[in-house]
Amino acid sequence: MAETDIAMPESTPVDSRPAFAIVEELKTKFGENFYVQTTCEEFPTVWVERSRVQEVLMFLRKVDRPYVMLFDLSAMDERLRVHRDGLPASDFTVFYHLLSLERNSDIRIKVALNESDLNIPTATNIWPNANWYEREAYDMFGINFEGHPMLRRILLPTYWEGHPLRKEYSARATEYTPYMQNQAKQDFEQEHLRFVPEDWGLKRGNADEDFMFLNLGPNHPSAHGAFRVVLQLDGEEVKDCVPDIGYHHRGVEKMAERQTWHSFIPYTDRVDYLGGCAQNMPYVMAVEQLAGIKVPERAQVIRVMLNELFRINNHLLFCGTAIQDAGGMTPVFYMFADRQKVYDIVEAITGYRMHPAWFRIGGTAHDLPNNWHKLVKELLEWMPKRLNEYHTAALKNSVFIGRTRNVAQYDAKSALAWGVTGTGLRATGIDFDVRKYRPYSGYENFDFDVPLEYEGDAYARVMVHFREITESLKIIQQCLDNMPSGPYKADHPLAVPPPKDKTLQDIETLITHFLSVSWGPVMPAGEASFMTEVVKGASTYYLTSDKSTMSYRTRIRTPTFTHLQQMPSVINGSLVSDLIIYLATIDVVMADVDR
């Protein structure tokens, strides 16, 4: 063991669950010096010595039935964590969340670091999408990934001071002196914004010619949000490009440390502001996993129905704007009219439209209203006819096909290497849909197909989105036909807010209700995460509780952060016009990327 490595506790007993078989494979290959952490999850969390982490990661990448995807990578400041009995000593912990499609299982690898030595080898030579994840961990925690090709800030400006997800970094504006802007500070910030190609890893030219550099964004209609792409051009050809993100960053993971488990729910709506209730799902289910709450069947089906309504709304907007960016102006206006019908249902059920924040820990905010089924029936009768019109008039249009066929194309191997999930992965022929692979909230009881395309181009991505609308309608029809009776919220002391009907009957229930609503519930110490298929791909909330009313660490893995990172590998060598089509068909919302 290297001098800077941190000793492991004694090995833990073998777990017989299938997902834990990989632990024995690791021990066979590397010996017994691993520590398997107990969590609330159905897959192993294994602590590894820093000196062996690259070997272990490479083994997992190449093992039989390999862990082909680096699903997430981040860190945690453990210095103020109280309830970590038995865990290896660690000031900062770096973790790698890996996914195996063949095993249909995950593994989390953890590495303990001492505050005085925050160096760890890069994983970019194993998974290319480690690039942005490591830059984010450097930006937020100050972790130094040795061998990284361009370790610089990614979400914050280069002149930013400090690392915001460290515990000494204040979370409230009231803890800072008032912000003052003067000419010297303005000049300093502007100078740091000066474009220097070498800072971005770009060459100014070659022996024969100079390249032109062009900023697409940060305010460009085809960027679908505030972000910039620095283009290195030779005429119309894109020689190289570098996405520049962070314009929407608002520190949502830091906010989670100062909100109660319940009061953080509205923030989840706004990670992907088009996802609505679907964005609540991974968070509340992770909290329920942590608390051991079993959600009633009626609440599960209601959640599924709301999820699919927001999936339809997202996909209608996606298809309309994709066609618009390819030159077809009319369909997007019709699709916006259809989206209003969905929003009418959402508003009737939740009281709000885009940001309902309606799911609760243990169920939903309230029951379905009277005559809810009438609006749903109208949508189910209306949408199939409209979809037929869109398919005939727009998606079979020769101009649209010409602009999207064989454009911005990538294969399944590339998609997995870059961590692509959702429709972008299914457009390459891989049928990974969390609702099917790992059913949750009763999805195993629904009959629906997973649409696939195989070309991996822009047209394939549009068609997968479009066909998924039909499948969502099928699921909603089954919700309508088979809505269970019963409660809409779990009768559990940690469900929030707790049932109010008994508060007038005995003082103990009244006190519990008061504490839960005012201070928030105290969740058991431990770790939990939950993966769901949100509207843009697979999303996970990884929660660490230190037995408090607030989360100690909330890690939000969003799908589009890694989708956007794939851009140079797809677009380099193409035309600028192809970049526009690419951006139109990867379904990116910048709030989801930047968090």
Swiss-Prot record:
It is found in: Cell inner membrane. InterPro entries: NADH_DH_suC, NADH_DH_suCD, NADH_Q_OxRdtase_suD, NADH_quin_OxRdtase_su_C/D-like, NADH_UbQ_OxRdtase_30kDa_su, NADH_UbQ_OxRdtase_49kDa_CS, NADH_UbQ_OxRdtase_CS, NDH1_su_D/H. Its EC number is 7.1.1.-. It catalyses: a quinone + NADH + 5 H(+)(in) = a quinol + NAD(+) + 4 H(+)(out). It is a peripheral membrane protein. Residues 210-595 are annotated as: NADH dehydrogenase I subunit D. GO terms for cellular component: NADH dehydrogenase complex; plasma membrane. Coiled coil: none annotated. Residues 1-186 are annotated as: NADH dehydrogenase I subunit C. It holds the Pfam family Complex1_30kDa. GO terms for molecular function: NAD binding; NADH dehydrogenase (ubiquinone) activity; NADH:ubiquinone reductase (non-electrogenic) activity; quinone binding. Keywords: Cell inner membrane, Cell membrane, Membrane, Multifunctional enzyme, NAD, Quinone, Translocase, Transport, Ubiquinone. NDH-1 is composed of 13 different subunits. Subunits NuoB, CD, E, F, and G constitute the peripheral sector of the complex. In the N-terminal section; belongs to the complex I 30 kDa subunit family. NDH-1 shuttles electrons from NADH, via FMN and iron-sulfur (Fe-S) centers, to quinones in the respiratory chain. The immediate electron acceptor for the enzyme in this species is believed to be ubiquinone. Couples the redox reaction to proton translocation (for every two electrons transferred, four hydrogen ions are translocated across the cytoplasmic membrane), and thus conserves the redox energy in a proton gradient. This is NADH-quinone oxidoreductase subunit C/D. The lineage of its organism: Bacteria, Pseudomonadati, Pseudomonadota, Gammaproteobacteria, Moraxellales.
